[in-house]
Amino acid sequence: MLSRSMKDLLTMLKQHGINDERLLEAMSKVPRELFIDEALSHKAYENTALPIGNGQTISQPYIVAKMTSLLELQATDSVLEIGTGSGYQTAVLANLVHHVSSVERIKILQWQAKRRFKHLDLHNISTRHGDGWEGWVSKGPFNAIIVTACATEVPQRLLMQLADGGRMIIPVGEQQQMLKFIRRLGNDFHYQSIEAVRFVPLIAGELA
């Protein structure tokens, strides 16, 4: 039985053009209040980004849904996520695909996210404390890559971890950020600009 707040969230997503029933069902299975501080739980189903500590945020539900829908995910897919953060986006992905490999540079966030995945009985997720710019070579190649922090440029190491036909969604830019969709076809990469966004920066090398 879905709560009134969850129903309202799903209705809002539909009004914003999110009509993929598999995606909406996946989001309905992930209680957003588990991924934020208890003091902010009254805002859990608002369409807004919220702080999760360590200078990081949980993205607004619309952006989570939009980025996920652009990846054209199949149940058999293997997905790389750069920036586990709270784990909310990871959990949505895990309800849609065969396996999610997620990299987080802040150890405490990785640890907290792993506890949430266990609580939700999600066992098709691997997490790693590492540099997102490097990806996770040994787990690849990936059918899809989602980057949840803004890079100054598209990391070449991530492009090389896309399988043929693979899709990537990534915010790129400095003062002005643009959500980019990239599809790999053989050794060619096709780029498409989606919309202006606002994400925390994808920091290279500095593990915390």
Curated annotation (Swiss-Prot):
Keyword set includes Electron transport: no
GO terms for biological process, alphabetical: methylation; protein modification process; protein repair
Reactions accelerated catalytically: [protein]-L-isoaspartate + S-adenosyl-L-methionine = [protein]-L-isoaspartate alpha-methyl ester + S-adenosyl-L-homocysteine
Predominant subcellular localization, coarse grouping: cytoplasm
A GO cellular component annotation in the UniProt record: cytoplasm
EC assignment: 2.1.1.77
SUPFAM superfamilies: S-adenosyl-L-methionine-dependent methyltransferases
Record key words, sorted: Cytoplasm, Methyltransferase, S-adenosyl-L-methionine, Transferase
GO molecular function: protein-L-isoaspartate (D-aspartate) O-methyltransferase activity
Active site: 59
Compartment(s): Cytoplasm
Enzyme class: transferase
Pfam families membership: PCMT
HAMAP family to which the protein is assigned, alphabetical: PIMT
Family stated for the protein in its record: Belongs to the methyltransferase superfamily. L-isoaspartyl/D-aspartyl protein methyltransferase family.
Family matches, as NCBIfam families: pimt (TIGR00080), PRK00312.1 (NF001453)
Function: Catalyzes the methyl esterification of L-isoaspartyl residues in peptides and proteins that result from spontaneous decomposition of normal L-aspartyl and L-asparaginyl residues. It plays a role in the repair and/or degradation of damaged proteins.
Protein name as catalogued: Protein-L-isoaspartate O-methyltransferase
